[in-house]
Amino acid sequence: MARAYGANASLLAAFEPSYGANPSGSTDYWKLPFVSTSLGSEQGLIANDLIGLGRDPSAPIRDVMKVEGDMVVPIDLRNFGLWLKALLGAPTSVGDVDHQHTFGSGQPVLPSLALETGLPDIPAYFESSGVMVNSVQI
């Protein structure tokens, strides 16, 4: 079995048209630098509420799928605006030559991302959709 090296890992990101909807085939993904990621999906089991099938309880049913985890990314000039847009929503932009982007908090709907972490040495690729940025630490 191949061994994955971090230097060869890749992170691709694209904004989704609506929450959980995969970007279309013509959407360009950005290749982003990252330090580490622990994104992963989990689907637990919940008790089945069906009654009337005898004394034995029914088998549990699947709960909703959750994608959780942390991602460490560097603060760089090229991609910092993308992370601000994911955290605060689309900016208000003014200017034709000298652009000025203003980000504000409190927007009712925030964008979601489709992220793909790739380990080409194995090869293994993990896609997570509906990813939203919760917080940023500097």
Could you tell me what each predicted segment is?
Residues 1-138:
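Signature of extracytoplasmic/envelope-associated structural regions
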